[in-house]
């Protein structure tokens, strides 16, 4: 199963993540305690042996162009209502792999109805990968009855409040293509190797 460990800030964190995960991410151009500058991000992209996603909440094409040109990444993770025309421009101009986030409510009165609305939203986009999250890196779990429905229709990457203690049960329930974690493998705002190791071992133990 695909494992992305997001929100790295240093070469030391990158090295830890590379030992366990398939991809990582750097937070740019948004409000986050994990946000880093372009130079730091470029250095991490250059050092990395795994894909480094540039993660941002911007819907401004010119900002995405800056991110791509100043970091050198080919992987983008979009947490905004950016339109398909803008995505097409970025894909045609730069050839980037794009993962688009879709928000799932924390609690649903009608999982089937909510899932159908989100399916319509997803189907209005053409992107390389679909990320299901509770919010913009809020670290809270969402209603997995919805993501379970979506995972039957799309290859989804699941995010939102995952940690070493809950990921096994959640992955068995939702059956996603992959998972994305950040705060759930941190200690004192830094990536913790023991938490990352436990998280990845639990994910990899699941046979879907």
Curated annotation (Swiss-Prot):
Belongs to the TrpF family. Pathway: Amino-acid biosynthesis; L-tryptophan biosynthesis; L-tryptophan from chorismate: step 3/5. It is an enzyme of class 5 (isomerase). Keywords: Amino-acid biosynthesis, Aromatic amino acid biosynthesis, Isomerase, Tryptophan biosynthesis. One of its GO terms (biological process) is L-tryptophan biosynthetic process. Its EC number is 5.3.1.24. The keyword Amino-acid biosynthesis applies. This is N-(5'-phosphoribosyl)anthranilate isomerase. InterPro entries: Aldolase_TIM (IPR013785), PRAI_dom (IPR001240), RibuloseP-bd_barrel (IPR011060), TrpF_fam (IPR044643). It comes from Methanococcus maripaludis (strain C5 / ATCC BAA-1333). GO terms for molecular function: phosphoribosylanthranilate isomerase activity. It catalyses: N-(5-phospho-beta-D-ribosyl)anthranilate = 1-(2-carboxyphenylamino)-1-deoxy-D-ribulose 5-phosphate. The gene is trpF.
